[in-house]
């Protein structure tokens, strides 16, 4: 019991304990505000995603951390949601919560119709029409695309993959972090 520092927890005064709990809440709320600020700056509901499969190899490996941008990348032109063929986008299929990272292989847009995209994983043999919502042959750029990939950090996302595949690790990690914040004195 003493190895975890729980004996120190008993000796904390209520005011010290409350201070440590509030410090932990401050850390969590700061992380949340940074995430929301990044979401606003990138115009993306999820500005950072992790590659979950090998469908984009060799460009991206499973566990790579991707940075997304959903604003116009060309600063000298008027803002448009233009996406080029060959660009790598991340999208959510309507009704599913898993972000998919694939390359745009074709685009269609009429004078009065929204931009529609056809995507395909670099390591896949066929395009993504099987992944789209039933009866859909293309993605609606405005409604389904989360953002375009502008950078990445290799393998850093494996931490989130491990926490998703082993829920007990998430609980243990949060418990240890909370305990360290409460027990540690400044």
From Swiss-Prot:
GO terms for cellular component: signal peptidase complex. Residues 42-186 are lumenal. The keyword Protease applies. Residues 172-183 are annotated as: C-terminal short (CTS) helix. The keyword Transcription regulation does not apply. Its EC number is 3.4.21.89. CDD domains: S26_SPase_I (cd06530). The active site is at 55 (charge relay system), 102 (charge relay system), 128 (charge relay system). It is a single-pass type II membrane protein. The chain crosses the membrane at residues 21-41. Component of the signal peptidase complex (SPC) composed of a catalytic subunit SEC11 and three accessory subunits SPC1, SPC2 and SPC3. The complex induces a local thinning of the ER membrane which is used to measure the length of the signal peptide (SP) h-region of protein substrates. This ensures the selectivity of the complex towards h-regions shorter than 18-20 amino acids. SPC associates with the translocon complex. Catalytic component of the signal peptidase complex (SPC) which catalyzes the cleavage of N-terminal signal sequences from nascent proteins as they are translocated into the lumen of the endoplasmic reticulum. Specifically cleaves N-terminal signal peptides that contain a hydrophobic alpha-helix (h-region) shorter than 18-20 amino acids. The C-terminal short (CTS) helix is essential for catalytic activity. It may be accommodated as a transmembrane helix in the thinned membrane environment of the complex, similarly to the signal peptide in the complex substrates. NCBIfam families: sigpep_I_arch. PANTHER family: SIGNAL PEPTIDASE COMPLEX CATALYTIC SUBUNIT SEC11. This is Signal peptidase complex catalytic subunit SEC11. The gene is SEC11.
């Amino acid at each position: 019991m003493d190895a975890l520092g729980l004996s120190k927890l008993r000796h904390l005064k209520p005011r010290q304990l409350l201070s440590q709990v509030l410090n932990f809440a401050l850390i969590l709320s700061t992380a949340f505000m940074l995430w929301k600020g990044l979401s606003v700056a990138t115009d993306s509901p999820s500005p950072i995603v992790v590659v979950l499969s090998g469908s984009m190899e060799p460009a991206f490996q499973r566990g790579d951390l991707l940075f997304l941008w959903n604003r116009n990348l060309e600063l000298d032109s008027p803002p448009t949601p233009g996406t080029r063929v060959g660009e790598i986008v991340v999208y959510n299929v309507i009704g599913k919560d898993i972000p998919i990272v694939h390359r745009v292989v074709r685009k269609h847009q009429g004078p009065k119709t929204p931009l529609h995209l056809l995507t395909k994983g670099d390591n896949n043999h066929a395009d993504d029409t099987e992944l789209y919502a039933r009866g859909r042959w293309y993605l609606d750029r405005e409604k389904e695309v989360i953002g375009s990939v502008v950078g990445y950090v290799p393998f850093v996302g494996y931490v989130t993959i491990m926490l998703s595949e082993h829920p007990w690790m998430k609980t243990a990690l949060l418990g240890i972090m909370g305990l360290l914040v409460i027990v540690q004195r400044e």
